[in-house]
């Protein structure tokens, strides 16, 4: 289950969101948290911090951009964010950085950079959402289970997941629309 943005932190709907997340977790759902925290909510950081921590604790995967972490923690560097802010709550961390390599950190000291395909993007709107979609596609395609996640993913599993995530994100940037093409979707469907 993918959740994120300010909606996942908003105190007004927090009881409903927290209840839904707890229900999903209790029933074995894999929880992927895209922090997606924007500067427009910067003045609310102190108010939402307890909800943020609770989301981090419930998540199996935490993804955010270096911009998110620059706003939230005043540190955009993946290692600093993971070690100081994330790893205590969630062991699987993904930090996207636009055209720069995606940084992954996980249990047992796993740390790897995944270079982005060099291209001239038509638009980057939707790149993060499509990265998330590609990651979830990878979980399904690779048959990654709750047991795999609890045990800790292998480097090969991470590599495959990041290939899928980056393929979706790159495809999205090739056009003015904020989603992958129908043709790309048809090709990906054949991989399932």
Over which residues does each language-model region extend?
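Conserved residues at the C-terminal ends of beta-strands
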Residues: 4, 65, 96
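Conserved phosphate-binding/catalytic region of the ribokinase-like
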Residues: 22-23, 76-192
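N-terminal glycine-rich phosphate/adenylate-binding segment common to multiple enzyme folds
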Residues: 1-8
């Amino acid at each position: 289950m993918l959740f994120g943005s300010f909606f996942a932190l908003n105190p007004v709907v927090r009881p409903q969101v927290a209840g839904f997340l707890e229900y999903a977790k209790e029933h074995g759902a894999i929880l992927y948290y895209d922090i997606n925290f924007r500067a427009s909510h910067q003045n609310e950081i102190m108010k939402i911090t307890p909800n943020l921590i609770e989301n981090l604790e419930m998540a199996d995967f935490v993804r955010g951009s270096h911009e998110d972490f620059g706003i939230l923690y005043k540190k955009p560097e993946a290692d600093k964010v993971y070690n100081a802010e994330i790893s205590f709550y969630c062991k699987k961390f993904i930090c996207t950085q636009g055209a720069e390599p995606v940084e992954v950190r996980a249990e047992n000291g796993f740390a790897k950079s995944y270079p982005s395909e060099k291209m001239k993007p038509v638009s980057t709107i939707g790149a993060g959402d499509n990265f998330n979609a590609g990651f979830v596609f990878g979980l399904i395609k690779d048959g990654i289970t709750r047991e795999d996640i609890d045990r800790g993913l292998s480097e090969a599993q991470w590599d495959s997941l990041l290939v899928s995530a980056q393929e979706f994100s790159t495809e999205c940037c090739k056009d003015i629309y904020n989603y992958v093409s129908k043709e790309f979707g048809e090709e990906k469907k054949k991989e399932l």
